[in-house]
């Protein structure tokens, strides 16, 4: 009978950290690793199954015989089974055969596998990475610019349906083909980042990747691990950051996955009032179990370390934070204080964000969090969860509600489009128009818009303009940028043929120009999360559905004036106040003919010394229907700059004097 040699990659300290929930490098120790022991090449296996009666490795190398290669339980009662099997290596297909305490046999994939068979096959594959990265300068610059303001315009992509190949059975692009086609497109469109919906291995394609079984493996539907590395490397070479959707909120009940891994609930909560997710018929991680915390945070750092990912967007955070999420009374258990907050999940998220910030400065974590849970993007040392950004679901809901209304009724709902400014700076917000808004009979963004064909496109351009010029960053799901007419389908992909039509090309050009204006003007992004970057001119012209506001960068940056007009009336002369005189040049106008508009544009305007909206100067311009205009002011006059500098110096002197007085007072008391 073949034997398994005793060999371990784990030290006693590793095990202690693992059991304390503080081992965040488990991917280097657990799972399968090609090694050499006593001159023999083979594979070392290590798996956590604390309640198993026996664990063996089965595979194509032993005819899937569960009695052939039985692993050794560690002496320390850690629940880890391990051993070395000589004569096998990279590419070996395997599973763990787990005999439960009840005598049943379960065939499980490796939770730490770096590659899996292509679904519907479910076995793991021994893999060692072989890729030479070329993004040293990108990583260095990312680290050095950590915590500095930067532009964030994100293109959300479902890798399996961004583009299909009809001539080849309507198959999806693989990762290398995406590097050749998606990266140049994102670069041309001016997006700063691409966010991939989950690339981790998942058995059910229509889950879009959110039902993960292989947390440490990119889906083999799209190629090998090195192919994804090549895609990310190509993005970095093009100056594009890469974000991955990460799903620590739940996992599916597929029997080759984490559910009942050793016949008991070790990865999920044992009580289904906490452990079962009613929305997705999936299972909730036990965030109070230290081994699970080590597993999840190791997984997050794995993608950052070995795949050079620039950020993780954490899915369904709200479902993690509350025990009663989507549960009726009597279907959930309160925490130890009688509340509904999941204290273990809150603690886990803080640990996760601290680990990312410490190990990978410059990497962003983004929360999809739909409730009013406080301080999601505040530092953990201030009591926050520590995320870098949070999706602004309130803006999305209110804005879509507003834009769905026929313009004639919008005058009575101005609050829907302005309310977001009440709380815009309470968190660091990312404004989402994501995949969730264009599925499940919600219709496409274009078909949410009211009116005839021209009005639908004009409304859509105005919506995008408002999203881009609103404080915060923005994310747009693929297809939205060309005004897709149908809902997104993972089987059909983006309707690229629509670019044959003028209006659709116009929307695409509009998004491209929005991105280029956004990235090139610090006023659009430098103070994206600070009230310093935004100033109301007017928000109360409800009759005409007009908003006017300023976007501001640093002191020496040119100021942008944004005019939103969400009604169908054309006004030959509309006046708004401006903060100073000089020339105000129209740098963007969604009614330009190249975007599919009617062609009412303004060019450069000289400010008048006519007071308006509490300002000493004003400009008067043509205001097209259903549009967004952006004017750029001249640099602040030298006298204004000088006054600002003098005022700053005066304030600093006062502060220093006050501090000295306070210090002297304390010295006198002592």
Residue ranges and their predicted role:
Residues 47, 96, 157, 186, ...:
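Conserved, mostly hydrophobic/aromatic
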């Amino acid at each position: 009978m073949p034997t398994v040699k005793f060999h371990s990659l784990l030290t006693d300290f590793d095990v202690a950290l693992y059991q304390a929930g503080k081992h965040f490098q488990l991917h280097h120790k657990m799972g399968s690793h090609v090694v050499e022991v006593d001159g023999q090449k083979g594979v070392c296996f290590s798996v956590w199954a604390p309640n198993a009666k026996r664990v063996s490795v089965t595979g194509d190398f032993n005819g899937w015989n569960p009695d052939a290669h039985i692993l050794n339980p560690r002496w320390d009662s850690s629940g880890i089974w391990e051993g070395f099997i000589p004569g096998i290596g990279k590419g070996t297909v395997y599973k763990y055969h787990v005999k439960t305490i009840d005598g049943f046999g379960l065939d499980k994939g490796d939770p730490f596998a770096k590659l899996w068979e292509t679904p519907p096959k479910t076995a793991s594959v021994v893999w060692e990475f072989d890729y030479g990265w070329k993004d040293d300068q990108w990583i260095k610059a990312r680290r050095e610019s950590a915590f500095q303001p930067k532009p964030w315009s994100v293109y959300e992509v479902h890798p399996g349906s961004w583009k299909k190949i009809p001539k080849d059975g309507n198959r999806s692009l693989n990762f290398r083909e995406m590097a050749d086609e998606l990266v140049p497109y994102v670069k041309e469109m001016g997006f700063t980042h691409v966010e991939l919906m989950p690339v981790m291995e998942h058995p059910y394609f229509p889950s879009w990747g959110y039902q993960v079984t292989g947390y440490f493996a990119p889906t083999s539907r799209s190629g090998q691990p090195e192919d994804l590395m090549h895609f990310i490397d190509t993005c970095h070479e093009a100056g594009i950051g890469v974000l991955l959707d990460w799903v620590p909120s739940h996992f599916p009940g597929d029997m080759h996955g984490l559910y009942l891994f050793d016949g008991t609930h070790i990865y999920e909560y044992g009580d289904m009032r906490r452990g079962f997710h009613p929305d997705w018929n999936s299972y909730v991680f036990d965030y109070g179990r230290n081994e699970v915390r080590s597993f999840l945070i190791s997984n997050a750092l794995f993608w950052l370390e070995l795949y050079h990912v620039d950020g993780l967007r954490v899915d369904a955070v709200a479902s993690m934070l509350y025990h009663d999420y989507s549960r009726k009374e009597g279907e959930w258990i309160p925490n130890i204080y009688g509340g509904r907050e999941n204290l273990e999940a809150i603690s886990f998220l803080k640990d996760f964000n601290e680990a990312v910030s410490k190990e990978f400065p410059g990497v962003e974590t983004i929360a999809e969090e739909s409730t009013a849970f406080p301080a999601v993007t505040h530092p953990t040392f201030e009591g926050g969860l520590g995320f870098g950004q949070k999706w602004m679901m309130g803006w999305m809901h209110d804005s879509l509600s507003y834009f769905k209304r026929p313009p004639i009724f919008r005058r009575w709902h101005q609050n829907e489009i302005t309310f977001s400014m009440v709380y815009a700076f309470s968190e660091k917000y990312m404004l989402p128009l994501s995949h969730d808004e264009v599925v499940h009979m919600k219709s496409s963004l274009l078909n949410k818009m009211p009116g005839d064909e021209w009005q639908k496109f004009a409304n859509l351009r105005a919506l995008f303009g408002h999203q881009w010029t609103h404080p915060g960053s923005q994310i747009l799901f693929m297809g939205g940028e060309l005004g897709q007419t149908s809902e997104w389908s993972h089987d059909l992909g983006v309707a690229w043929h629509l670019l044959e039509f003028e209006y659709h090309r116009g929307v695409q050009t509009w998004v491209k120009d929005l991105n280029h204006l956004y990235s090139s003007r610090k006023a659009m992004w430098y103070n994206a999360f600070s009230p310093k970057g935004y100033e109301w001119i007017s928000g109360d012209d409800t009759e005409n559905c007009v908003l006017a506001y300023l976007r501001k960068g640093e002191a020496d940056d040119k100021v942008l004036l944004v005019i939103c007009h969400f009604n169908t009336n054309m006004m030959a002369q509309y006046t708004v106040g401006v903060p100073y005189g000089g020339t105000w040049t129209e740098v963007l106008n969604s009614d330009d003919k190249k975007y599919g508009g009617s062609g009412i544009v303004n060019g450069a305007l000289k400010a008048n010394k006519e007071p308006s909206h509490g300002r000493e100067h004003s400009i008067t311009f043509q205001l097209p229907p259903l549009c967004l205009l952006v004017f750029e002011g001249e640099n602040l006059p030298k006298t204004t700059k000088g006054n600002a500098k003098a005022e700053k110096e005066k304030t600093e002197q006062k502060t220093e004097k006050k501090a000295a007085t306070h210090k002297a007072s304390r010295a006198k008391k002592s």
